[in-house]
A protein has these predicted regions:
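ATP-binding N-lobe of GHMP and related small-molecule kinases
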Residues: 1-99, 117-126, 163, 170-175
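A generic local secondary-structure boundary/capping motif
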Residues: 32-34, 129, 139, 155-161
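Contiguous, small/hydrophobic- and glycine-enriched helical/loop subdomains that border
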Residues: 86, 108, 112-149
């Protein structure tokens, strides 16, 4: 079995993110509204007769073996399909790593879509999402993306009113934030503020993007330390540049702002790009039909 195809792997944003509590399996129950944007990696998948799944990437510091989630996704797919062919994955990365933008998860989801196209195995979107859940918590969402309410550890997906196409500026400071450490900090708090998830869904239903932007909220921002104070500074600069709202995505360290018009977004991006190498002007996109 041979063949090659290329799939885009879109970044995801968390319009809201709530941690409901720790689970007995080591994960946490989450509730979040997620949104895809056009910033993407390119994932080229080639079938061959080597019997080996491996990857290569334009980022030398990323793993290319079984530690790479895209490779794990290929292994899960082949096992489920009963196939023994080899898979070569070429990842052209644009999405920042350690940013809370789901780059690895989206790459894994793109591999699942590509393998379904190449093999014609006949898996449904739901089955691809189930495979994705074996690889990572965000992978099921990334299979089709769009505007979704995600619950459980991220695998329970409910469609909400799609967000219209809007300009977005993403800025990642030059430091990572430890995901396990953030969860530990949240778990240690006896009380916490909660995002208005219902309010965000209602704003989407009403098409009221300023109201949605004002309600964007990420509980992880409450447990950032002074060392991570640059997150708040970037948010302020986005808001000063005209963003309707700004918030950290996932466990960071990327921050994004939603804008009403492209000119304001471009201006804000230019200002931030003077100080940050990883700064992107992109836009929201809809859900894939699979």
């Amino acid at each position: 079995m041979t063949g090659t195809t290329t799939e885009p792997a879109w970044a995801k944003l968390n319009l809201s993110l709530d941690v409901l509590g720790a689970r007995s399996d080591g994960f946490h129950d989450l509730r979040m509204v997620m949104q895809s944007v056009d910033l993407h990696d390119d994932v080229t998948v080639t079938l061959d007769d080597t019997g080996v799944c491996r990857a290569e990437t334009n980022r030398s510091y990323l793993p290319c073996g079984a530690d790479n989630v895209a490779v794990r996704a290929a292994q899960v797919f082949l096992s489920r399909a009963g196939l023994t062919c080899g898979v070569h994955i070429r990842l052209h990365k644009r999405i920042p790593v350690c940013a809370g933008l789901g780059g690895g998860s989206s790459d894994a989801a793109a591999v699942l879509r590509a393998l379904e196209r190449l093999t014609g195995a006949g898996f449904t979107r739901t089955q691809l999402e189930e495979m994705g859940a074996q690889v990572g918590s965000d992978v099921p969402y990334c299979v089709a993306g769009g505007t979704m309410l995600a619950e459980g550890r991220g695998e329970r997906l409910t469609p909400v009113t799609p967000m219209p196409r809007m300009p977005v500026v993403i800025c990642k400071p030059d430091f990572p934030i430890s995901t396990p450490e953030l969860f530990h900090r949240v778990d240690a708090r006896t009380s916490r503020c909660r995002p208005d998830t219902e309010g965000i869904c209602a704003a989407l239903a009403d098409g009221d993007m300023p109201r949605l932007a004002r309600r964007m909220y990420n509980v992880f921002e409450d447990v950032l330390t002074h060392r991570e104070g640059e997150i708040a500074a970037i948010k302020s600069r986005l808001l000063d540049g005209g963003a309707l709202g700004a918030v950290m995505s996932g466990t960071g360290s990327a921050v994004f702002g939603i804008f009403a018009d492209a000119d304001s977004a471009a201006y804000a991006k230019r200002r931030l790009a003077r100080d940050y190498a990883e700064c992107f002007l992109t836009e929201t996109i809809g859900r894939l039909e699979i």
